[in-house]
Amino acid sequence: VPKLMIIDYALAPEYLEAGAEGMLDIRVKNTSSAQKAKNIKFSLEEESGEILPLKTSGGYCKEIKKGGEYTWQIPIRAIHTATSRPHSVSITMEYEDENGLALTAVDQIILEIRQQVRLEYDRPIWPEKVVPGDTAAFSMNVMNLGKSTLYNVLLTFDIPEMASGSSVLLGTMQPGESKMGS
């Protein structure tokens, strides 16, 4: 009985940015030393729906000889709102042996999606008057305009003749969140 399995895969580019396209190459091997696999139908599915095929989700190969290999190429796209994380993608291979017996194999691959970081800030709010020797405080609004959670956000500032190398840890910022650092 022929047995198909994914032995390698490659994504170009190396990872998908949300909203971007890529080409996925999936290398399949028939591990049988006795029979070829024929009428092979490939399909791709990512459970969250954040990775989609550009055209059809399927592909076809007439046969893979015993011990042979085949590379299935499928153009894919990550939707604009895709989460920045590794995504598990199912590859299903439906095929027949030489006698027409229907067989199915399913493998999982991992594709990385990244979201562009968008961190912006308002102008600093200064005290109206600063007297030498006093501690002058200022504040600044920092906004996460991206779709990814930002961790360990650190606001570092250098104010000539007042403060040098001071920092404020804003911590974790969820998408769409603003924090005031002072």
Where are these regions (language model features)?
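Enriched for extracellular/lumenal, surface-exposed ectodomains of secreted and cell-surface proteins
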Residues: 46, 60, 89-99
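Proline/serine/threonine-rich low-complexity linkers at boundaries of modular beta-sandwich domains
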Residues: 1-6, 48-51, 108-120
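Short beta-strand and strand-turn-strand segments in soluble, beta-rich domains
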Residues: 47-59, 158-167, 177
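Short, surface-exposed loop/turn segments at beta-strand-coil junctions that are enriched for proline
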Residues: 77-84
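Short beta-strand elements of extracellular/lumenal beta-sandwich folds
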Residues: 18-33, 129-151
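Short acidic, flexible loop segments centered on an aromatic residue
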Residues: 31-50, 145-162
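Short strand-edge motifs at loop-to-beta-strand transitions and within beta-strands
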Residues: 68-74, 177-182
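Short beta-strand segments of immunoglobulin-like
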Residues: 10-16, 61, 124-130, 170-171
